[in-house]
């Protein structure tokens, strides 16, 4: 479903942000 795709995208974005922040 669209909502599921949206949740997975937002979750992936959050993880990427965490990695960027942690790495920085």
Swiss-Prot record:
It is found in: Plastid, Chloroplast thylakoid membrane. GO terms for biological process: photosynthesis. Pfam families: PsaN. It comes from the Eukaryota. It comes from Cucumis sativus (Cucumber). Residues 1-24 are annotated as: Disordered. Belongs to the psaN family. This is Photosystem I reaction center subunit N. The lineage of its organism: Eukaryota, Viridiplantae, Streptophyta, Embryophyta, Tracheophyta. Gene3D superfamilies: Single helix bin. The gene is PSAN. It is a peripheral membrane protein. Keywords: Chloroplast, Membrane, Photosynthesis, Photosystem I, Plastid, Thylakoid. One of its GO terms (cellular component) is chloroplast thylakoid membrane. May function in mediating the binding of the antenna complexes to the PSI reaction center and core antenna.
